[in-house]
Amino acid sequence: MIFIYAIIALLITFILVPILIPTLKRMKFGQSIREEGPQSHMKKTGTPTMGGLTFLISIIITSIIAIIFVDHSNPIILLLFVTIGFGLIGFIDDYIIVVKKNNQGLTSKQKFLAQIIIAVIFFVLSDVFHLVHFTTDLHIPFVNFDIPLSFAYVIFIVFWQVGFSNAVNLTDGLDGLATGLSIIGFAMYAVMSYMLDSPAIGIFCIIMIFALLGFLPYNLNPAKVFMGDTGSLALGGIFATISIMLNQELSLILIGFVFVVETLSVMLQVASYKLTKKRIFKMSPIHHHFELSGWGEWKVVTVFWTVGLITGLIGLWIGVH
């Protein structure tokens, strides 16, 4: 059945994307590009965005099929809720952006509040309604030590889900970058899930991988479509949720290492400019720094993928030992 889920997820996305692209073009749902960004990006202006809808639809349909046939499918139900919740936030954000024809969508406060609501509902569904059981201890790899957080774990969940949903969003600035890194990350968690005896989560990870593989050919340079916030916010929320449900939260720092570095580069850039009026990087997130330093877009993407693969394998090894 796993093979069937994979094929269904792959085919749905692969078929939907070429249908959605001309529809988005007719509706003029094109991406606006930052004027201060690399000049090579200006030609991307008008490229259809909100393409994340395709793999989210694929994930939803395939997950519902899996829920019907998989024993102990509660983890898939929860992951599906997070997918829809964060995806809806991204969809609303994208819709506002393309209607206004600028790069401003939901305000930071609106987006943050909506993400917090989804994270809290996730905890309530998990803990109060017992859809799944996970410990409220923060597991520290290698030292066989857990930090009991008790109620503070709710705060951690909010921080983790909101943080990583925005981290993937920040990384989605080059053709294929976030998509490829997500495929790598979900592959690591698929293996980890089976090794930690969580097959339902493993099945969901496989659905994620193949849904994204159906999207990747259209998202590679030169991209025919962008996933938009619709896709990136959902992907980040899913990553955080999987790490929480496996009680391997800190593994995400390595499995999602590039996402972490991209986010830190933005935070450091903002802090440095506010404190010293000087910038650390030529532009943030850091992938733009390398572009402005003379790297081609494809080189940046492949190097970042390679880093993501190496750190992902390390994160996987730590997670299962």
Curated annotation (Swiss-Prot):
HAMAP family: MraY
Keywords of the record: Cell cycle, Cell division, Cell membrane, Cell shape, Cell wall biogenesis/degradation, Magnesium, Membrane, Metal-binding, Peptidoglycan synthesis, Transferase, Transmembrane, Transmembrane helix
Molecular-function annotations in GO: metal ion binding; phospho-N-acetylmuramoyl-pentapeptide-transferase activity
Catalytic activity annotation: UDP-N-acetyl-alpha-D-muramoyl-L-alanyl-gamma-D-glutamyl-L-lysyl-D-alanyl-D-alanine + di-trans,octa-cis-undecaprenyl phosphate = Mur2Ac(oyl-L-Ala-gamma-D-Glu-L-Lys-D-Ala-D-Ala)-di-trans,octa-cis-undecaprenyl diphosphate + UMP
Cofactor(s) demanded: Mg(2+)
GO CC list: plasma membrane
Organism: Staphylococcus epidermidis (strain ATCC 35984 / DSM 28319 / BCRC 17069 / CCUG 31568 / BM 3577 / RP62A)
One Pfam family hit: Glycos_transf_4
Enzyme superclass (EC): transferase
Similarity comment text for this entry: Belongs to the glycosyltransferase 4 family. MraY subfamily.
Pathway: Cell wall biogenesis; peptidoglycan biosynthesis
Membrane topology listed for this record: Multi-pass membrane protein
Transmembrane segments: 1-21, 50-70, 76-96, 112-132, 140-160, 176-196, 200-220, 225-245, 250-270, 300-320
Protein name: Phospho-N-acetylmuramoyl-pentapeptide-transferase
Protein EC: 2.7.8.13
